[in-house]
């Protein structure tokens, strides 16, 4: 998705907290964006270093300036470092796109320090809080596979009244069964496997 956005959204800047190869924000570079440096400010990708809060604040500043779209990525567990900026983006109703990968315990060799547990609950609490305009403070999206991710990216890019969060996995995931109504992502949920009229158990999945 980021590779396509690099080709089609010239006023977009993407940043990563020293993790672009891991959180796949380097897709923006692969799509043609050049890296911003002290000698070249014409690029579209900002290497923020290990500075998650600063990165989020820079994206807020870019968005406040106007005329630009900003997105930033890191591991989901590090969203904790960004909370003050996320909260301010929500209060100011800024359409910053937060890309958080490695959303579960499958984080490779990094171990429990990099395994998000309580982070989604915190972000979800912000989602349904009404802002000063009476709208949700945040759009939180956790797609189930690559097809749902495409729809969720479209939703995030269309959302210009609040921050958007894309909570993504580390590992490759098999697509859901053929015929899954991915367009229902826009409604908040969809049925991927039907049952009879009176099921004994209903499994509800998130991500």
Please place each PLM-identified region on the residue numbering.
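Long hydrophobic segments that form regular secondary structure
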Residues: 161-162, 166, 183-207
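Thiamine diphosphate
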Residues: 1-175, 181-185
């Amino acid at each position: 998705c980021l590779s396509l956005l690099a080709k089609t959204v010239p006023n977009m800047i993407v940043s990563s907290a020293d993790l672009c190869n891991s959180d796949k924000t380097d897709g923006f570079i692969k799509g043609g964006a050049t890296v911003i440096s002290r000698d070249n400010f014409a690029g579209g990708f900002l290497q923020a270093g290990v500075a998650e809060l600063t990165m989020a604040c820079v994206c807020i500043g870019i968005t406040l300036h106007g005329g630009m779209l900003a997105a930033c990525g890191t591991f989901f567990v590090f969203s904790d470092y960004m909370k003050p900026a996320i909260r301010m983006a929500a209060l100011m109703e800024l359409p910053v796109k937060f890309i958080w990968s490695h959303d579960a315990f499958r984080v490779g060799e990094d171990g429990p320090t990099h395994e998000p547990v309580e982070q989604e609950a915190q972000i979800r609490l912000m989602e349904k809080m009404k802002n000063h305009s009476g709208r949700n403070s945040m759009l939180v999206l956790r797609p189930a596979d690559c097809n749902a991710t495409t729809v969720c990216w479209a939703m995030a890019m269309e959302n210009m009244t609040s921050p958007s969060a894309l909570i993504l996995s580390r590992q490759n995931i098999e697509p859901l069964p053929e015929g899954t109504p991915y367009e229902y992502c826009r409604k908040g949920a969809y049925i991927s496997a039907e049952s009879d009229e009176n099921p004994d158990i209903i499994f509800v999945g998130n991500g």
